């Protein structure tokens, strides 16, 4: 049994390592505080995404204890003060065992024997360090690690030569453990090049692949300075039911390119369940918590880090993914599925299919444990996620697994599961109409909104959508730079919000793209206002900013919008909307256009050199106010009101517009005073047709 004193010491060591990066929740809370100071509140088909590994040559359905031969394939506590001296002293107490092996030798049996000896010697007070000397070696079976072992392989290259689809390394020599996070403890793997060598495997195209290292039911795990090579249809490193882990300084490279299905993340965070993580009983649904993944390199691989399976109502917690480098990835770099209290910061992603994907639930691969009570009220919480200071360059659109793949920089989405009429699940790489049958996996039908996500100070470029929010609430998108190519065959957008509520889009710099610069669309269920504030938007092929169907009182303020191929700012169906202090110029349609917006306020905007009118309100934008605006040098009229009543147009300035200073068509103008005119066409006049002006 683990002695608490030493367990605490080792836990402190891990805590100190984790503290190299600030606690995830602290960063996110700081970001939320910053946002709060700026704004005042107003008001993949289951088969495809299942683990494609062969389950350790043992049936995942068997629950009895199984002893593996060498060739088989297969705590909560307070953080205490820690000093570097404590860590050094603890490491000095390690026992060392050196593998006696010749260059070129198969080390499977010898290393397993040495690891078993280390298991018998190691204690919580005195770990064992097992050293694989530099050299080139082969592996023909699965290695078995145990608690309190430090496996050191710097300078060694270990190459799989077995034709079987079997794991390179796992914990324990039996499927059973104490479960939860108590099965194994104090595990370190340091150094070595571990080549999965898919070329040696027979029937590569047949069902399944194999995982490199599979680590489950453990606490205090470190994997560092390891090079992982040549994966076959699965993961290099997979963790489930792991608490307190750090993966740092590792390199992941190479995969079998003839297979493009499944997730194939290099690092997969998972849960201890039979279909998705076989071979680690009990299947109690333990997930990963307190994980740091930093300073790693991923190149020429299918996907980077993340999860494509989840436990319902049991999120992965306190995940930090920082300062990693991703180069030439077919799919996404990072997938945060059902994550909570997470930071994704300082990563560089170059030539990737997608950058960061954040999703509340994925019912096609969501799981429950036997006897778990579930309801639509479950899995509803603020994710508290920060995505900041990442550099993302996205590849051209392509076809993956027979389906069109359109890239993105950042995608933040909720889900509506089967049973909500008229709704569909936002999906990434499979059918957009993809739904899950709640009777097959116990997940209730309902809306699972994504909440509490901040995307800040990211730089995104390439052939993609920039930043996307779907079914999102209480989220922020601030200070990002998005430079898109417009050579697409689809309408890529700078920032898009679909069915959003209380989304704050501020101080972003957006350019290029075939679609909208900012696209923000809500639903009749949207109860909290959205704010689009201080953004710079230029060169999009549709409207620079489109806001439609958001909560009453939503605000579009102090944005600078130019050279859009349509309108600069288009606002539709938002009552009491505020369009204030914007600069909209050189757009190929109108500077600002409102449609079906009751009781809107359009104030203090500067609109110039637009190809049609400067400001236009039409289609029953009744009881709205247009005041204090400057409309100059537009090719038609400075202001046009059509099909609306109860409009006040006061204190505006009309200068050098080629058409009329102002036009009123089939409208009732309740107040018209204090306006100024200079150098407009048609003798500086206004034009009135089938309209009534109550007061000039």
Where are these regions (language model features)?
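Sec-dependent signal peptide cleavage junction
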Residues: 20-35
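Right-handed parallel beta-helix/beta-solenoid
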Residues: 70-113
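N-terminal extracellular ligand-recognition/capping segment immediately after the signal peptide
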Residues: 105-112, 125-166, 173, 194, ...
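Short, T/G/N/S-enriched strand-turn elements that build extracellular solenoid repeat scaffolds
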Residues: 111-122, 138-147, 178-179, 236, ...
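Right-handed parallel beta-helix
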Residues: 181-328, 333
């Amino acid at each position: 049994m683990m002695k608490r004193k030493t367990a605490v010491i080792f836990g402190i060591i891990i805590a100190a390592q984790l503290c190299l990066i600030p606690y995830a929740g602290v960063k996110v809370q700081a970001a939320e505080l910053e946002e709060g100071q700026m704004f005042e509140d107003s008001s993949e088909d289951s088969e495809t995404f299942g683990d494609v590994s062969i389950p350790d040559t043992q049936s995942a359905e068997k629950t009895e204890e199984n002893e593996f031969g060498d060739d088989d394939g297969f705590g909560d506590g307070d953080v205490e003060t820690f000093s570097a001296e404590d860590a050094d002293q603890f490491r000095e107490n390690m026992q060392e065992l050196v593998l006696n092996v010749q260059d070129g030798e198969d080390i499977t049996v010898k290393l397993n024997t040495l690891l078993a000896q280390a298991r018998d010697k190691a204690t919580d007070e005195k770990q064992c360090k097992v050293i694989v000397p530099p050299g080139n070696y082969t592996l023909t079976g699965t290695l078995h690690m145990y608690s309190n072992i430090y496996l050191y392989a710097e300078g060694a290259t270990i190459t799989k030569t077995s034709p079987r689809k079997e794991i390179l390394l796992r914990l324990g020599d039996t499927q059973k453990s104490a479960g939860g996070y108590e099965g194994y403890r104090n595990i370190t793997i340091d150094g070595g090049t571990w080549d999965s060598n898919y070329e040696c495997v027979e029937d590569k195209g047949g069902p399944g692949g194999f995982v490199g290292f599979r680590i489950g039911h453990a606490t205090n795990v470190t994997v560092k300075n390891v090079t992982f090579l040549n994966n076959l249809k699965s993961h290099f490193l997979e963790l489930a039911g792991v608490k307190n882990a750090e993966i740092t300084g590792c390199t992941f490279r190479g995969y079998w390119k003839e297979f493009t299905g499944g997730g194939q993340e290099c690092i997969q965070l998972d849960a201890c369940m039979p279909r998705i993580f076989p071979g680690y009983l009990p299947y109690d649904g333990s997930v990963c918590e307190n994980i740091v993944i930093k300073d790693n390199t991923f190149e020429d691989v299918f996907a980077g880090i993340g999860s494509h399976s989840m436990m319902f109502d049991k999120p992965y917690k306190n995940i930090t993914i920082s300062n990693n480098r991703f180069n030439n990835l077919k799919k996404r770099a990072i997938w945060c599925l059902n994550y909570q209290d997470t930071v994704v910061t300082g990563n560089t992603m170059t030539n990737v299919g997608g950058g960061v994907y954040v999703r509340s639930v994925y019912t096609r691969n969501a799981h429950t444990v036997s006897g778990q009570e579930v309801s639509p009220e479950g899995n509803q919480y603020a994710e508290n996620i920060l995505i900041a200071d990442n550099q993302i360059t996205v590849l051209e659109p392509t076809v993956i697994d027979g389906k069109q793949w359109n890239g993105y920089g950042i995608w933040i989405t909720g889900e509506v599961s089967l049973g909500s009429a008229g709704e569909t699940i936002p999906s990434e790489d499979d059918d957009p109409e993809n739904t899950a049958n709640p009777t097959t996996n116990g997940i209730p039908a309902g809306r699972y909104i994504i909440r509490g996500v901040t995307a800040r100070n990211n730089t995104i470029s390439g052939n993609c959508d920039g930043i996307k929010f779907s079914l999102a609430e209480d989220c922020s998108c601030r200070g990002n730079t998005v430079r898109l190519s417009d050579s697409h065959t689809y309408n890529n957008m700078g920032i898009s919000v679909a069915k959003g509520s209380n989304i704050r889009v501020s101080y972003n710099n957006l350019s290029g793209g075939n679609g909208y610069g900012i696209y923000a669309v809500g639903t009749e269920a949207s109860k909290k206002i959205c704010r689009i504030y201080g953004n710079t938007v230029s060169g999009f092929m549709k409207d620079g900013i489109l806001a439609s169907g958001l909560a009453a009182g939503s605000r579009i303020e102090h944005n600078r919008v130019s050279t859009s191929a349509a309108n600069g700012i288009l606002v539709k169906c938002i009552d009491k909307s505020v369009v204030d202090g914007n600069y909209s110029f050189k757009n190929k349609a109108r500077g600002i256009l409102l449609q079906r917006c009751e009781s809107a306020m359009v104030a203090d905007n500067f609109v110039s050199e637009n190809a049609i009118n400067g400001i236009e309100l039409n289609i029953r934008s009744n009881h709205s106010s247009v005041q204090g605006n400057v409309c100059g040098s537009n090719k038609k009229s400075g202001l046009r009101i059509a099909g609306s009543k109860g409009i006040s147009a006061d204190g505006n300035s009309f200068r050098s517009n080629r058409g009329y200073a102002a036009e009123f068509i089939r409208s009732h103008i309740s107040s018209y005073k204090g306006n100024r005119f200079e150098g407009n066409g048609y003798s500086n006049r206004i034009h009135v047709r089938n309209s009534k002006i109550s007061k000039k």
